[in-house]
A protein has these predicted regions:
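Flexible nucleotide-interacting loop at or near the entrance of a catalytic core
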Residues: 2-4, 212-319
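ABC ATP-binding cassette signature C-motif
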Residues: 1-216, 296, 300-489
């Protein structure tokens, strides 16, 4: 058995007073298939960089294996894909690469195409295939699902299940359940390792949270009772002491003795109260705040907001989708599904009014207001105040929404460009949620989003039932939210 030993690990970014990690100790087995979870901004990618030795830290990290990071930085993406893979792992055997590619459903011919002409999903699969051919390496896999469709996620999850020796950062619950045997979670107050998959971790967390909340309630009730009892005893003792004036020596001695006993009892009660307070302070440290969100959608009083009739989208000679017909009515939560390249994002942008080459008919209802969230966070920068003003939402409302999504005030005061991808996605979603609109159009809204925030979004959409058209590859989210599905390809 080979171990990764982390001892007294502490790290703080330059210019920050808040440590990301403080005196962290853990042992990780290099044979584990380890899922790595935690709210956005907690330090998952930072921890991977510490393992890679890219950041200076206090403490020690000892390992008998090397670390390889996904996604691997490609210097010249114009090369043939085969040459790019050779730069990642120079000594792989060709037949071994083909074996791995076959497991991932990737055809051999794409090796002889320029790497930058491949889809993001194809690039993901090729990189994983070749990285697992590197010997004596422990893979650090950082959010591989962001560019994978639902079928691709299923294939990669099954593939990873056949491997061992990796840390996998992902927020896709079904994907994690399909391939991991341990969970590493960054909680509010600590970092912990558990055996099992995501679902078993979540069940344990829910059980622990419920237990701590009930214990907290009992202790608070006991503290209140003890405080009241101590107050009554102290008041009685004071009254009795006052009656000693004018009494005879025997009476005063008796009364004083009784008052002393009562005072001793009062001190004992105070001690029990302090013990209860100390016990209470140990609870609730890892309970995540997941406040309910509210959405501000306007009612629409016509029967149809959007109608597509026999829509075909083509780029030159390449047709990406053909003869698509559907309607969006008030209350519809439509999931647009299909493999990568089937025209889902193009169809959304067509509805938004972009000049997408197409035939067929697209009708938008009179006065329909749309709110759009792109799958990409590129280009987001500047201050939150300026963004709120430009998007026509109240800054205080936006700040409140982001706080409920787990973003600290210090994070919202930064230049948006400096935020993590998950935090940027929360900003974009929060803006959309705050906008007064008739129809929300969200393109892969869960990219980079942590699990707690995903469940908050699910609760929001199921509670307020807004009209929404969305593209998403998170299987659980689609099953929970969609009341209609349109399949392309």
């Amino acid at each position: 058995m080979s171990l990764i030993q982390v001892s007294n690990l502490s790290f703080t970014y330059d210019g920050s007073f808040q440590p990301v990690f403080e005196n962290v100790n853990m042992q990780l087995d290099t044979a584990w298939r380890l899922g790595f979870i935690g709210r956005n901004g907690r330090g998952k990618t930072t921890f991977l960089k510490l393992l890679l030795g890219e950041l200076h830290y206090q403490g020690s990290i000892h390992a008998s294996v090397g670390f390889s990071y996904f996604p691997y930085p490609v210097k010249d993406s114009s090369q043939l894909a085969l040459y790019v893979l050779e730069s990642i792992c120079p000594d792989f055997l060709y037949w071994q690469l083909l074996r791995e590619m076959n497991l991932l459903g990737v055809p051999e011919e794409i090796l002889y195409q320029p790497y930058n002409t491949l889809s993001n999903g194809e690039q993901t699969k090729l990189q994983l295939a070749v990285l697992f051919l590197r010997e004596n390496q422990f893979l650090l896999i950082d959010e591989p699902t962001n560019h994978l469709d639902m079928l691709g996620r299923t294939l990669v999850s099954r593939y990873l299940r056949t491997k061992s020796g990796f840390i996998l950062v992902s927020h896709d619950r079904a994907f994690l359940d399909g391939c991991i045997d341990h969970i590493l979670s960054i909680n509010k107050a600590n970092i912990e390792v558990q055996k099992g998959n995501y679902s078993s971790w979540w069940e344990n967390k829910q059980r622990q949270d419920a237990f701590e909340l009930e214990e907290n309630r009992k202790l608070q009730k006991e503290i209140t009772r003890l405080q009241e009892t101590a107050r009554e005893k102290a008041q009685w003792s004071d009254r009795v002491e006052a009656t000693k004036i004018g009494q005879g020596p025997c009476d005063r001695g008796y009364i004083g003795h009784k008052a002393a006993k009562m005072m001793a009892r009062s001190k004992a009660i105070a001690g029990r109260r302090e013990a209860a307070i100390a016990e209470k302070s140990k609870l609730l440290k890892n309970i995540e705040r997941a406040d309910s969100l509210k959405i501000f959608q306007l009612p629409y009083h016509q029967s149809t907001l959007v109608r597509l009739q026999n829509v075909t989208i083509s780029y030159g000679e390449r047709t990406v989708c053909r003869d698509i017909s559907f309607e969006i009515r008030p209350g519809d939560r439509i999931c647009l599904q299909g493999p990568n390249g089937s025209g889902k994002s193009s169809l959304l942008r067509l509805i938004l009014g972009e000049a997408i080459p197409h035939t067929g008919e697209v009708r938008i209802g009179s006065g329909v207001r749309l709110s759009y969230v792109s799958q990409s966070t590129l280009g987001l920068g500047g201050s939150l105040r300026d963004l709120a003003r430009d998007q026509g939402v109240e800054e205080s409302l936006l700040l409140s929404m982001l706080a409920k999504l787990g973003m600290a005030k210090t994070q919202t005061e930064k230049d948006l460009e400096s935020l993590s991808d998950g935090q940027k996605k929360k900003v974009l979603l929060a803006v959309s949620i705050c906008q007064k609109t008739h129809l929300h159009i969200w393109d892969e809204p869960l990219n980079f989003m942590d699990v707690i925030s995903r469940t908050q979004l699910e609760e929001l959409l199921l509670t307020f039932k807004p009209t929404i058209l969305f593209v998403e590859h998170d299987k659980m989210f689609c099953e929970h939210i969609a009341n209609k599905t349109v399949t392309l390809g």
